[in-house]
Each structure stands twice: as C-alpha cells, then as structure tokens.
C-alpha cells in the first residue's frame, strides 16, 4: 500500500531529517493499525520519478531496513525509514495531515523543493550533484 501526499514549498518547523506533525502521526498510526502488516518495522519514505515536476514521494510499509537507509523515530510506535537514495532530497521535510470538507491528504513541506506542479503531486529539488573534483597531481 502506498500513501500519497501533496508537496508544499516552505520551511518546516523542526530541523531534522524528517518530522511529522501530531495530526500526521495520528493518521499514520490509524492506517498501520487498520492494515496489520506482518513484520512491519515502520514506514519507508522514498522518492520516485513521476509527475510534471519530476519527483514524488513514496511511503510504504517497511519490513526490513536496507544497509544505507536512515531510521528516524517519529514516535515510540512509529519508525520512518528514509531510503538512502531519497535522503538528500528530503532532509528537513515535515509531513502533515489535513482534513477539509472536500479532501483529506498528507502534505509534505520540503525546504529543498524549488518547484511543484500545479496539483502539488510532484516536485523539483535543488541540484545536489557533486561537481567534478580537481585533485592535485602527484609529483
């Protein structure tokens, strides 16, 4: 099962790899209690190429942690496992959950996002590529 959300530009309220508001935490707990996934160790946060702006979030139930993944403890009952390939793009992101008369959705407030598409489903981040390094020549 995947959980989708909308991306918002802006600054999160906390400085962390990834954080969740109380409303997001409450909703994630409800979903996890409803699904009862065997051997679930938390939620895996990742990104994939999709949408007008290039990237969107993936949030799935995790049954194992990969070697370079980062574990963030959102609550004593919830671990967020950040996929190593997504780490630079999501550092500082805060996940929120809103309920309005016409929609209920998760929102990701990502300080690294430089652009979002019109519907907010996808985003672009700063370029984190490492420039070519010029090493000194050995004599």
From Swiss-Prot:
Function: Involved in the assembly of mitochondrial iron-sulfur proteins. Probably involved in the binding of an intermediate of Fe/S cluster assembly.
Taxonomic lineage: Eukaryota, Amoebozoa, Evosea, Eumycetozoa, Dictyostelia
SUPFAM superfamilies assigned to the protein according to its UniProt record, in alphabetical order: HesB-like domain (SSF89360)
Keyword flag Protein biosynthesis: no
InterPro entries: Fe-S_cluster_asmbl/transfer, FeS_biogenesis, FeS_cluster_insertion, FeS_cluster_insertion_CS, HesB-like_dom_sf
Any one Gene Ontology molecular-function term assigned to this protein's record: 2 iron, 2 sulfur cluster binding
GO biological process per UniProt: iron-sulfur cluster assembly
Major subcellular site: mitochondrion
Cellular component GO terms held in the UniProt record: cytoplasm; mitochondrion
Residues that coordinate or bind Fe cation: 52, 117, 119
Protein name: Iron-sulfur cluster assembly 1 homolog, mitochondrial
Pfam families: Fe-S_biosyn (PF01521)
Localization: Mitochondrion
Organism this protein belongs to: Dictyostelium discoideum
Keyword field: Iron, Iron-sulfur, Metal-binding, Mitochondrion, Transit peptide
Similarity field: Belongs to the HesB/IscA family.
Keyword Signal: no
């Amino acid at each position: 099962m995947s959980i989708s959300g909308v991306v918002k530009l802006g600054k999160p309220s906390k400085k962390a790899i990834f954080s969740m508001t109380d409303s997001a935490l409450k909703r994630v707990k409800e979903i996890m209690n409803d699904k009862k996934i065997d051997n679930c160790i938390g939620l895996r946060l990742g990104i994939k190429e999709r949408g007008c702006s290039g990237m969107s979030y993936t949030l799935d139930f995790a049954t194992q942690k990969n070697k370079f993944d980062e574990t963030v403890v959102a609550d004593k009952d919830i671990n967020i496992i950040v996929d190593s390939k997504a780490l630079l793009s999501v550092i500082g992101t805060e996940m929120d959950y809103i309920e309005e008369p016409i929609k209920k959705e998760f929102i990701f407030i990502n300080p690294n996002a430089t652009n979002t598409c019109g519907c907010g489903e996808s985003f672009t981040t700063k370029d984190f590529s490492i420039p070519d390094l010029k090493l000194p020549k050995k004599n």
